UniProtKB/Swiss-Prot annotation:
Lyase in keyword set: no
Compartments, record wording: Cell membrane
Transmembrane keyword on record: yes
Protein name: Uncharacterized protein aq_1264
Chief location: membrane
Organism of origin: Aquifex aeolicus (strain VF5)
Protein's membrane topology: Multi-pass membrane protein
GO annotations of cellular component type: plasma membrane
Residues passing through the membrane, by range: 13-35, 71-93, 98-120, 130-152, 165-184, 218-240, 247-269, 274-296
Keywords on record: Cell membrane, Membrane, Transmembrane, Transmembrane helix
Length: 306
């Protein structure tokens, strides 16, 4: 994000072309997000109800682990796409941009939370659909603002808006970590025996050991997503005064990578590595929360002194 803070896009033609292609990508993402949402959840109350509770002829409630998995993927990709797009507004004095970014994040977060409201109450299906539509409207509005700013506005770094972005990312980090915790709990478990059985199998539970292909299918996509997420979180720590900042930034990269790769060690080098998996998982949660709260605290403190 260095060029979004102190750089000049319009005076740097290669950078201008890159940002233009980025905006094109964001437009394509927004367009295909309609199809993605319809394919996964459904763009009608009937399809949404079927996603949660099965077809009328064969009603079957979706498993909470499957719901958590779909929701955490949707939350991650939509937040990052919207966050990168919103970051471009940092250089342009567009009116109401703070309100727009907060509204977009709020609608996305409420859409995610509505899944669990539907799951446990079997109501509010229309609310989920409305929140997604509102998020898409705000996403497109942000895209229009970014294009307008790139064409017509003079570039000027907006540090107050940057603080807003950082606080929003920190809040997202907390919410996303909660989602990951419950997904981990439902799919793997929180105790030694749960993790051991998940990777090594258990004949009494008719659970087979994980294959290399199964492990790599989980590890490979998580490698890039975890790197992107924790690199961004560590990167934002550069903007706050912190004594042991470098150590925390290194831990934010090493611990999540250890947690992600620990499954291979359990499967091929012995079940004693279950302790490594559990330790790295709980440490990952702790340092994520710690980093996020430090960013929020600093953002609030600077606004009070402004």
């Amino acid at each position: 994000m260095r060029f979004l803070i102190s750089g000049s896009i319009k005076k740097n033609k290669p950078l201008l072309y890159i940002v233009s292609f980025l905006l094109l990508f964001e437009l394509l993402f927004w367009f295909f997000n309609w199809f993605y949402y319809d394919a996964v959840f459904g763009l009608s109350p009937e399809k949404l109800r079927e996603f949660f509770f099965g077809p009328p002829d064969y009603p079957e409630k979706i498993e909470i682990s499957s719901l958590l998995q779909e929701v955490h993927i949707f939350f991650f990709i939509n937040f990052f796409a919207y966050f990168v797009l919103s970051s471009l507004l940092n250089l342009f004095p567009v009116k109401f941009k703070n309100s727009v970014i907060i509204l977009g994040f709020s609608f996305l977060t409420l859409e995610v939370l509505s899944n669990f409201l539907i799951y446990f109450t079997e109501n509010f299906i229309t609310l989920k659909l409305i929140l997604f539509l509102l998020f898409q409207v705000i996403f497109f509005t942000t895209l229009i603002f970014s294009v307008y700013g790139l064409i017509y506005e003079k570039e000027k770094t907006d540090y107050d808006f940057l603080k807003t972005l950082i606080v929003i990312f920190a809040i997202f980090s907390i919410l996303f970590t909660f989602l990951n915790f419950f997904l981990f709990k439902e799919k793997l478990g929180l105790f030694y025996s749960d993790i051991r059985d998940y990777y090594l199998g258990n004949p009494e539970k008719f659970a087979r050991p994980k294959t290399f292909e199964g492990l790599i299918k989980v590890f490979h996509p998580h490698l890039i997503s975890i790197t992107a997420f924790y690199f961004a979180l560590a990167h934002f720590l550069l903007f706050i005064p912190l004594k042991y900042k470098a150590l925390l930034m290194v831990l934010l990269i090493l611990i999540p990578l250890t947690e992600t790769s620990a499954g291979f060690f359990i499967r091929y080098f012995g079940e004693s590595f279950v302790y490594l998996k559990l330790l790295s998982f709980y440490l990952m949660i702790f340092i994520t929360f710690l980093s996020a709260f430090l960013l929020i605290k600093e953002g609030i403190k600077k606004r009070e002194h402004a």
